[in-house]
């Protein structure tokens, strides 16, 4: 792992807890959420987190959450690269994303996401690049969902849950 990985992973749980807390009872199969808010588990604004709930076969119960966090080259702000040393408020660092529904029941909310990335006093400079990064993160999560489903099919849900608890202890 790269030396910065603990920073990315250490606060990911809080990002997932935020999505759960803010969306309990409203999540549906095919939904994907995005956030970068440092108040809700984010590190700095260029580190964007994409979270996908994994439902059971009936689509009624959430079994897992899959998340990916990636550093975007630019998320807006007063300087290119979104890491100004002289910022005074978080908005000067770029577009603040907090619990945004990125994919709704399998449909990328492209126009809404572009509008978000283009918003604020200091919007993203290359929205097409941000959208490509978000698509890659959605695809990474989907691969994680597929692999989790394969593990559950092979080992059973109880065994997978038991090993996940063991890793977290």
Regions found by a protein language model. Give the residues of each.
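Glycine-rich, charged/polar anion/phosphate-binding loops
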Residues: 36-37, 50, 82-84
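Short, Lys/Arg- and Gly-enriched loop/turn segments at beta-strand edges
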Residues: 41-47, 75-76
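Gly/Pro-rich turn-and-neighbor structural signature
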Residues: 1-41, 152-169
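Short alpha-helix boundary/capping segments
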Residues: 4-7, 11, 46, 82-89, ...
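A short, hydrophobic, proline-anchored segment that marks a local hinge/packing element in signaling
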Residues: 49-57, 67
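Gly/Pro-rich active-site capping loops and adjacent beta-alpha segments
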Residues: 61-120
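N-terminal leader/propeptide and maturation segments of large enzyme subunits in energy/redox metabolism
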Residues: 96-169
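Residues on a specific face of well-ordered alpha-helices
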Residues: 14-17, 52, 64, 95, ...
């Amino acid at each position: 792992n790269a030396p910065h990985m603990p920073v990315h992973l250490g606060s990911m749980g809080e990002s997932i807890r935020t999505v759960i807390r803010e969306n309990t009872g409203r999540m549906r199969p095919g939904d994907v959420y995005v956030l970068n808010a440092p108040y809700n588990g984010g590190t700095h604004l260029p580190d964007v987190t994409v979270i996908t709930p994994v439902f059971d076969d009936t689509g009624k119960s959430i079994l897992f959450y899959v998340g990916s966090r990636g550093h975007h080259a630019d998320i807006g702000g007063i300087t290119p690269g979104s890491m100004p040393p002289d910022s005074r408020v978080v908005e000067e660092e770029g577009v603040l994303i907090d619990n945004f529904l990125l994919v709704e029941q399998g449909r990328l909310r492209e126009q809404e996401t572009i509008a978000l990335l283009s918003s604020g006093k200091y919007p993203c400079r290359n929205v097409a690049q941000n959208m490509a990064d978000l698509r890659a993160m959605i695809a990474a999560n989907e691969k994680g969902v597929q692999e989790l489903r394969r593990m559950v099919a092979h080992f059973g849900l109880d065994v997978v849950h038991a090993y996940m608890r063991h890793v977290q202890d």
